[in-house]
Design a protein with these regions (language model features):
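C-terminal amphipathic helix plus adjacent low-complexity
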Residues: 419-487
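Donor-nucleotide binding loops and adjacent catalytic segments primarily
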Residues: 256-367
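N-terminal subdomain of nucleotide-sugar transferases
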Residues: 37-91
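Conserved nucleotide-sugar donor-binding subdomain of glycosyltransferases
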Residues: 103-160, 205-247
Length: 487
């Protein structure tokens, strides 16, 4: 039986705070508008953090009766086919297993975190894949004849299409599966976890840092990118890779809410659509499910599905740090890896599992301890869960910076926090109501967005816009000739 606290959390969920995909939807309706059935091609990087939100969007589209072809890595064939979409495999260098980027780009193992690591990751993981991604995309378009392409923001194989004639391609909608990759108002470069400048001195410091970042990362990777684009007959680009796709997409769906982004000028093509619904039934209930009855505070710790090769970074120290907290039940998920790989004894107040059903779990969680995966952070916020974050790799420094900046949690700003720091941070978030209050306000903002309707409306609108533009071009070019013939 649920306690008052747990029952309240469930009531919040039922009222729309937190999103879980429902099997019963109003078929083919967007607001009061009936949509046409479309052929939609999904294009996705073969990495779990990109795949999960695109699969959730796929299920929304399938429920509307749309025909979905899903282009991604062969390692995810079973997941795509089980969703009801038709699987289309990436080819050549584009078909890799992004669940372990160190196996994809082995040289990153020998490069310490820093600017050189970012440059190599951008060039080897993203730029080098563009020709094969683009060729795979062209083949899929030829075979599927889609009305629209929906891609994740790091499937850069769409760039040659975006740089070509719009009339020669389907409309392209991209999904922001990371923080919004636009230039910052204070001039700070992205990916370094720098807080918004509050003084002119900070702005001057950021200008110096930006020059160093531009010389070490942006310019070399842009040179590499433009060489690749030149071989495909397009380009060059003048803006950095991640920034360019935001500006070039016909529509860009940021999978979050405005409150979680720094204030800045945002193009009208960018739409905040909330977080995609959790797909239910991905894992069974654990045998200890009844223990999450609200009698103890539940702390969930996860390292996600990418940076989970070393559980000594976060999961093990969190389990040990909270072992003597009598009012806390710690739940750890291994992101699909065997629980035996967790390198510590499991304390009596902890429960572990390889996978857990998040649609059941999140309404019962009081604090999430995470390395800062964008999808996990946004899902937690949509349920009003405050956070403790510790991660500096990939995009995590900037994601976790936003956690602290928005007031929904504590950012430890390190890849390997100490047990003492973890315990203090968790107790701070549990014991100070301000964090839960800010997380609750964030959940309210998520609840105000009808994610399903927004996604359907945006995709439908870009298709309509494309048809109108093509019709207008036809009228403009053929109108006078028709008039002459009518004489």
């Amino acid at each position: 039986m649920l306690t008052v606290r747990a029952a309240s959390r469930r009531a919040d969920f039922c009222a729309g705070r937190g999103r879980i995909y429902g099997e019963t939807q109003e078929a083919r309706l967007v607001g009061n508008q009936r949509t046409h059935i479309m052929k939609i091609l999904i294009a996705c990087m073969p990495a779990t953090g990109h795949l999960n939100p695109l699969l959730a969007i796929t299920r929304i589209l399938l429920a509307e009766g749309h025909e979905i072809n899903f282009l991604t890595g062969s390692v995810f064939r079973a997941r795509i086919e089980s969703s009801g979409a038709k699987f289309v495999s990436l080819q050549g260098a584009a078909d890799f297993d992004g669940r372990n980027i160190l196996s994809v780009v082995p040289e990153l193992k020998d490069i310490p975190p820093g600017l050189e690591w970012f440059r190599v990751a951008i060039e080897r993981l993203f730029v080098d894949r563009i020709p094969a991604q683009h060729q795979s995309l062209l083949q899929a378009v030829q075979e599927c004849q889609p009305d629209v392409i929906v891609g994740d923001d790091m499937f850069f194989g769409v760039l040659p299409m975006l740089l070509g004639l719009r009339s020669k391609r389907p409309p392209i909608v991209l999904c922001g599966t990371s923080f919004l990759h636009l230039a910052r108002e204070d001039g700070a470069p992205n990916f370094l976890g720098l807080p918004p400048a509050t003084t002119e001195e900070q702005r001057r410091q950021y200008a110096d840092i930006a020059r160093e970042y531009d010389e070490a990362v942006d310019q070399p990777s842009l040179l590499c990118l433009n060489k690749a684009l030149n071989t495909l007959g397009v380009g060059p680009l003048s803006a950095p890779l991640f920034h360019s796709v935001v500006e070039l997409a016909d529509a860009y769906m940021q999978l979050s809410v405005p409150r979680f982004e720094f204030p800045r000028q945002i193009p009208p093509s960018v739409h905040f659509v909330g977080t995609p619904p959790i797909i239910p039934g991905q894992a069974p209930l654990p045998p200890w499910a009844d223990e999450l009855d609200g009698s103890r505070k539940v702390v969930l710790v996860t390292q996600g599905t990418v940076a989970n090769h070393n559980f000594e970074l976060l999961i093990a120290p969190t389990l040990t740090a909270l072992a003597n907290e009598p009012d806390v039940l710690v739940v750890a998920t291994a992101g699909g890896r065997p629980v035996e790989t967790i390198p510590c004894a499991v304390p009596s107040n902890a429960r572990v599992a390889s996978y857990l059903p998040f649609e059941w779990l999140l309404p019962r969680v009081d604090v999430l301890v995470t390395n800062g995966g964008y999808g996990s952070v946004n899902q937690a916020m949509s349920f009003g869960i405050p956070l403790v974050t510790a991660g500096m790799t990939e995009d995590k420094a900037d994601v976790n910076l936003r956690v602290a900046w928005s007031g929904v949690g504590v950012n430890l700003a390190t890849n390997q926090p100490t047990q003492e720091a973890l315990r203090a941070a968790v107790r701070t978030v549990l014991d100070r109501p301000a964090y839960r209050m800010r997380a609750s306000q964030m959940a309210d903002e998520f609840a105000r967005i009808d994610t399903r309707s927004e996604i359907l409306s945006i995709i439908n609108q870009v298709v309509v816009n494309q048809r109108v533009a093509l019709w207008a071009d036809t009228v403009t070019t053929s109108g006078p000739r028709r008039a002459i013939r009518q004489r």
